[in-house]
């Protein structure tokens, strides 16, 4: 996940990559 979206998509970020 992106560093910026990491805060918002902490969970989705893992799948979103």
From Swiss-Prot:
Main location group: secreted
Keyword Cell inner membrane: no
GO cellular component: extracellular region
Keyword terms: Secreted
Subcellular location, record wording: Secreted
Tissue: Expressed in skin glands.
Family statement drawn from the similarity comment of this UniProt entry: Belongs to the Frog skin active peptide (FSAP) family. Septenin subfamily.
Described purpose of this protein according to its UniProt entry: May act as an antimicrobial peptide.
Protein name, per record: Septenin 1h
């Amino acid at each position: 996940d992106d560093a910026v979206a990491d805060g918002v998509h902490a969970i989705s970020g893992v799948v979103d990559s």
